[in-house]
Amino acid sequence: MLQRDAVIDVDESEIPPIPFVLAFNDLTYNVTLQQRFGLRFGHSPAKIKTLLNGITGEAKEGEILAILGASGAGKSTLIDALAGQIAEGSLKGTVTLNGEALQSRLLRVISAYVMQEDLLFPMLTVEETLMFAAEFRLPRSLSKSKKRNRVETLIDQLGLTTVKNTVIGDEGHRGVSGGERRRVSIGTDIIHDPIVLFLDEPTSGLDSTSAFMVVQVLKKIARSGSIVIMSIHQPSGRIMEFLDRVIVLSSGQIVFSDSPATLPLFFSEFGSPIPEKENIAEFTLDLIKDLEGSPEGTRGLVEFNRNWQHRKLRVSQEPHHNSSSLGEAINASISRGKLVSTSYRSIPSYVNPWWVETVILAKRYMINWTRTPELIGTRVFIVMMTGFLLATVYWKVDDSPRGVQERLSFFSFAMATMFYSCADGLPAFIQERYIFLRETAHNAYRRSSYVISHSLVTLPHLFALSIGFAATTFWFVGLNGGLAGFIYYLMIIFASFWSGCSFVTFVSGVIPNVMMSYMVTFGYLSYCLLFSGFYVNRDRIHLYWIWIHYISLLKYPYEAVLHNEFDDPSRCFVRGNQVFDNTIMEGVSETTKAKLLETMSGYLGMELTESTCLTTGSDLLKQHGIEQLDKWGCLWVTLAWGFFFRILFYFSLLLGSKNKRA
């Protein structure tokens, strides 16, 4: 354990152990059911559902309090209520620690909430995962060596020493087992050695052996000086032996609250004795299910439990003589080596400044990404293959009218490719979303730091994509501008990737469903392509649709590459004899064309020959209505779209990551 002087200054005199007691009294939580279809007419009242109804109990330091019940009984809701995950005003009743109401900022420091899902980066090792958790949660005043010592101690406590250098793994990469993964998930949340630990069904989805090992670890954590409160669906007999107290719920009400060892006596007095060699938890849940299906429901069992509790209180007559004020208990806990990060009277919102958070997040991203080179390499390969395909289709286009149309077609398809290829990043944040929610719930880092690091880490990847596409198309298609033109072409491709990926990132932050986010992304990009100016010129778009033209992400990069290609006024694209191309006169002899040009010269009052330039690049830009911004203005607007969507992404995280229930 770390020394206390690295965390908080306390009296050097011997401080006796003062146990923590988390008490909750008469917790009631109601929700208004939303009507999914139709409207509510007249003054019919909204339907109210009670999720918690008068829940009272306590949990003590060194003990495991388990909340049992069938699905929908209110287990997770009660965990959320105790963990401060329900908005103030919605929850009735009180939750106190050593007799003092818990403020949300203090609760973040002294507690941890382990979600049911194992939310971890797959390509980090066990040790790296816990070390990053230490960087986020432990005080910056602690040295790197002390943080590493804490990680080593925790790895040993969790029984993960043999796999500490093994990656977490996922569907495509072999890693730790399910039980080990669950213990790592617990470890990331208890890195700061919390006083109170909440867990939502930590044994869910595990085999009996793995589940037993998880509960063994939780027992060690409780004995180290923590209160452990967890929900569990149907524990085995071995697991029941590790539980100190059990609360059994049915429809949001307590039907039993005591030591699991008293369950046989409880049900025997209720009139439903537990058969010998029967799994106690299984019998309890089956009996409750039968009662819930009866006309009276579980009212009789709820009332019997109340009488049971009253008799127990009269017999025990045990006051809370060990309970102490919260401040004294925290100081005593710190003196014994608990890693509460600071004084309970002065709690910082974050342990690190924003720039340190940004560096840590960027480092974690880079490690995770560099261990999946096949993903990055595949995307670069696909973009380069697309560029190679376009280069072979539009190989060395000339300066004829037909060549102009081919250039326009190439630019439209190329710019669309930039944006559509960004859609493969949609699942990335959606997969990380719950990791982000878990970490920011305890103020591990700022949302702004996450957005900045996320943006910075993507830049090298986007630059590699840009180089790959530009190098395989510019010279082989025969685009204009030489080296300067290539550099600008590379810049606008990079800006397009930046803008497209920023848009996709924003969508993934707003819509947490992969299929829906794909639909929104491709739908919006299709409209952007339609109104970009290639299919319909700006002056042909009706006034009621012109706004789509100006918010089209493809408009500005498309106009930028046209500027880069056609801005040279000395370059000619339609000469005298080419005026007949793509018309019924295209097949006539050159002599006839010369006579026609001579006749047209007389009517127009100007000399027209085969070499007379009729349309320059500047004329083409005017014909397509590209006059409002120059090529640099188009580049800046494209880049600005990227920053705009990153800002929107930040606000989507700010508004969408409120973890409390209404």
Curated annotation (Swiss-Prot):
ABC transporter domain mapped to chain residues: 22-276
Alphabetical list of PROSITE patterns matching this protein: ABC_TRANSPORTER_1, ABC_TRANSPORTER_2
CC annotations in GO: membrane
Sequence intervals crossing the membrane: 375-395, 410-430, 451-471, 486-508, 514-536, 635-655
SUPFAM superfamilies, sorted: P-loop containing nucleoside triphosphate hydrolases
GO function terms (MF aspect): ABC-type transporter activity; ATP binding; ATP hydrolysis activity
Binding locations of ATP: G69, A70, S71, G72, A73, G74, K75, S76
InterPro entries the record matches: AAA+_ATPase, ABC2_TM, ABC_transporter-like_ATP-bd, ABC_transporter-like_CS, ABCG_transporters, P-loop_NTPase
Localisation per UniProt entry: Membrane
Domain ABC transmembrane type-2: 356-566
Keyword list, A-Z: ATP-binding, Membrane, Nucleotide-binding, Transmembrane, Transmembrane helix, Transport
PANTHER family xrefs: ABC TRANSPORTER G FAMILY MEMBER 17-RELATED, ABC TRANSPORTER G FAMILY MEMBER 28
Family to which the UniProt record says this protein belongs: Belongs to the ABC transporter superfamily. ABCG family. Eye pigment precursor importer (TC 3.A.1.204) subfamily.
Listed name of the protein: ABC transporter G family member 17
Gene: ABCG17
